[in-house]
């Protein structure tokens, strides 16, 4: 059992190598320099090579970004989305990736793929030559689990914002031992109006570029969007939201494992993981407090929910229900592809985790509101009668 009370048996992933591309390889030169400057260039000596390499790549990205602006700038500006997006939301490690991959089986929907998200500044002009070259260095599996990875698979649009130089809580992964610099961007609730408009403009620009590529209604998946429903509805009044949730006793250890692995692979520091457990506990509360505050704002018929456990047990039934509740059209369009997808994943192996009883009690104490709302059994042999509702003023670095 590790010091954070989580014992992990990992399946899949990959072994890190210096030449493996990083999340930040698509950022422009000045965007990258700003992130390092914001953290006072506190780079570990052993990670100096990574910092220099990404800096050099940043020059190349800046050049390609200029080319894309010259070639596609006006077209992107005048492009309209086919329809307001469909947002798949939920906490990290709750099944958002699985649900995203199911939705994009529908040929009527488009999505931002991994290349677009990791090269958002120039993917329209560089994909044809750069994606195959860099693809030779890419791992075949995601670093955190047994899910396949390649440039054409759907990806979190939050990484696109990071690489566009927009502040994001994900950028804290680069300097995991430093105080958070972009905490407010998890919920967007306390972001100055000028910066919020910049965020909206960058996000919409990216979605327009994706629309040029796909020509379809876009399905997006990003856990931070769970906290941003108010802003997203301001931008996209007809947006649909699909919220997936999962047993907290499965979410917590998997999230700890996620941030530990990503900090180890993607950081310019050697992470010490101090305070990680508290960040995960607090961020979960922040996320669902923001989600519940925004829930009444969502018009009827624009939000549907599904549990990870139900989706895995009977994906066809649950997907058909989601289509019906959100009025997404004829489910028969997707049914054959969904059955094939399910068959292909029949041998999928998940990571396994063991939780120390003391950690289970702490999770039950801090997240009791979630256990009760979604009907998950609380750990036994623990008196939770006096467990408080999570503070609405809590603030912590997003995990």
Model-predicted segments: where are they?
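Post-Walker A helix-loop "phosphate-sensing" segment adjacent to the P-loop in P-loop NTPases
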Residues: 105-115
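Glycine-rich phosphate-binding P-loop
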Residues: 88-105
